[in-house]
Amino acid sequence: CLSSRNFGTKIVLWRSGRVGYTWKFGKGVNERLNSSNLYRFLEPITCWEADVDFEPKWLAWEITRRCNLNCVHCRSSSALEVEGHPDFSHEEAIRILDDIASYAQPVVVLSGGEPLLREDVFDIAAYGREKGLRMCLATNGTLVTPEVCSRIKEAGIKMVSLSLDGSSSAVHDDFRSQPGAFDGTINAARLFKENSIPFLINSSFTKRNQEEIHKVYRLAKELGATAWYMFMIVPTGRGEEIMAELISPEDYEELLAWHYQMEKEEDELLVRPTCAPHYYRVVLQKAKEDGEKFERRSLQFSTGGAKGCLAGQLIALIDVDENVLPCSYFPKSAGNLREQSFKEIWENSPLFLDLRDYKKYKGACGACEYVGVCGGCRARAYAVTGDYLGQEPFCGHVPFKLAQSGK
């Protein structure tokens, strides 16, 4: 709804859900304005997320760094044998769950590495469920069996995510550095469907497989996934070794535009670009071009955010060493659960407080009218520039302020 209008100064304040916008009227306003055509006549000045409660809504939890695959993009450089990062004990897992549950009730995704390599993974999930946490599981799928499906259901796991990076074994297995990985993922999807276990598919893309995006999307639908997340690589961990394979900013923009059109027409599969916060800018820009208001659907066990980068704002990662990180791709600790409570870290970490203060953002991101609904990928800025408050390096948008000033 329109919360305020002042046509004399040509300023409009707009509020839609949790997101607010400040716009000015562009040229050619010559018809009666209403909520359906307003977008076509406005030029953005700034966007913000209104009434934000910085509560932890979604936590990834690296319960092991061990993995049976050797993926080229792995954020944690996982391997079957990992030196210096042993699994924490079951007792420590219980302590962490008690700590989290005493403060919040987020979605908790048991991740890795490959979480199915931990013998107590289902005991951890069941305990988390008993504490009122919504437990999910992220697996590469290669270790899924009928018995695993039974254990998933018994533990009360709400959602499982699978990794699928190509529409064929040639592409996926190359990305995962393991022959047979594709067949394992497809088999896992089949077993989940047979056992009525809801699952989503995560797909990571670089130059080596970006031509597969449309095919993987269609395959995710065919497999019966609940949702499909298109991940744009953040070069951390082993991903640093494939920096030259990152999708170019120009191709990135084209893919986000394609995703917008696809999402508008998609009424079966929930879809979302991930680690692509500027998609929220693209949605607003395209909606304005189309002269329509685009309402996006949300997955029940998603991050719960109405904006782009949520690192340290609504989401976080707890790694196997009990460090609390802003997100899965942001290798900078905000604190350690062996030294502080989760509540203390979440509320008082200087790192998290920085990420929540958009006025501290630098470069084009700091000047951008979309900073409040995009924010740029803070992990990518940190990985590429070394400054987590720096400019998103893979966004080509020229902010309104900079365009007006000619800088």
Predicted regions and their residues:
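Short, acidic, Ser/Thr-enriched surface-loop or helix-capping motifs
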Residues: 318-319
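C-terminal accessory region of radical SAM enzymes
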Residues: 196, 249-298, 323-375
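A structural motif corresponding to the C-terminal lobe/cap of the Radical SAM core domain
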Residues: 221-222, 226, 241-268, 305, ...
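Radical SAM/AdoMet-radical enzyme domain recognition
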Residues: 90-111, 117-240, 245-248
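Flexible mid-to-C-terminal extensions adjoining Fe-S/redox cofactors in radical SAM and related proteins
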Residues: 21, 29, 40-55, 323-324, ...
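Short, small/polar residue-rich loop motifs at catalytic or cofactor-binding pockets
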Residues: 309-313
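N-terminal pre-core extensions flanking Radical SAM catalytic domains
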Residues: 4-84, 98-101, 295, 342
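Cysteine-centered iron-sulfur cluster-binding motifs in ferredoxin-type domains/subunits
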Residues: 62-70, 114, 365-372
